[in-house]
Amino acid sequence: MKKKCLILFKWPNYLNKYLISKLSNFYEVEHLFISNYKNENFSQTVDKINSTIEYKKIEIVFFDVDFAKFMNFFFINRIKKVKKVMVTYDDYAVHEMNAITANSCDIILCQCPLSTLKYREKGYESYWMPPENDANIFKNYNLNKEIDVLFFGQLRNDRKKFIDFLIDNGIKVKIVGHESNWATEEELIKLISKSKIVLNFSKSLGETVTNYAAADIYKFHYQLKGRLIQSGLCGTLCISEYSPGQEMIFNEKEIPMFRTQDECLEIVNRYLSNNELLKKHSNHFSSKMLELYEEKVNFKPIYKAIDQPTFKKVELVAIPYWYVRIAAKQIIKKNISIWNMLSSFSQLKQVLKVLEKSSIYVQLLVTIETILNILWYSIKSIKSKN
């Protein structure tokens, strides 16, 4: 009999279905969205989730934490009597915050193997889990390879410059997923199957890399992208911009990597001009993906780890001021309005619990800011309704 698990998503997202599908192979799965708890304050949200866990006899909860500042260390600690698994897809951007949130969980699952090592370095039990690696969804249709180069995704930042450079040098590139040129999931998978090469870019897409601890510092990071996994499962070679995550699991023959436009053009031309080389490396890449990284293979050690009775814990010396400040603000902002200001003030005791192990200086600063936030966001709620 399958154990029951609950996925606590922050809000609806296209990646959610992959996690639901993945876990359904191993567990009886329920899911909730934090964004649906619009009329509940912090305490009420926690109580409702705990009631659901008890009523449905949930044994494991998976927390979708990226950019969900409400779903932090203090919130997760209030979820009782279950094994807790943190899931992160964008850890490159929010690792400093996630690494503290992780302390409230038993297992950490990362989209990138580099992030997995970062958590292990701190003593956490962490595993690599790509979201889009289900061979029942992403499969090779064995179609005629009539598309030279396929790119699917948004043409932001310098992606367009790379693609324009290829086109200007005589390479035929099919672009899907930009502006109105969309395809269904099934259409996209068939397009990948009929392509000789899938082109992947690794730079993050935001204007800067989010930094909750201070001002943003970096313009981008090099990420491991899902296109690599999808391409391999569909039997197509992926040529990719460099990222350290993919370098950890693939070599140059499995995924040729470039950094510059000239390197990209040279690699594309090398494979398009040599069908035997293209076929050989495509087959090797696809075989490795299916044998080592396909969903059922990849998740087995994770399932075994979650099933263990006890977990090692990492001791935090302190939780930094910036993190405590964010957590306190999230407690107060939950369902705040001028009409329920008294309820918001009642949540001050939850903020004081957050501050229990902080210095007197931090307690004073955060308490004063919390009172001001209650007043400010209550007044602001009137303006937003007018």
Where are the language model's segments positioned?
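Extended catalytic core of nucleotide-activated donor transferases of GT-like folds
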Residues: 5-124, 137-138, 372, 376-379
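Catalytic binding pocket for nucleotide-activated donors in carbohydrate/polymer assembly enzymes
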Residues: 9-26, 31-39, 113, 182-314, ...
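P-loop/Walker A phosphate-binding loop and immediately adjacent motor/lid segment at beta-alpha junctions
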Residues: 76, 121-134, 214-215, 234-236
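Generic beta-sheet signal
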Residues: 87-89, 111, 129, 152, ...
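Conserved catalytic-core segment of nucleotide-activated headgroup transferases in glycan assembly
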Residues: 132-197, 203-213, 218
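C-terminal amphipathic helix plus adjacent low-complexity
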Residues: 276-386
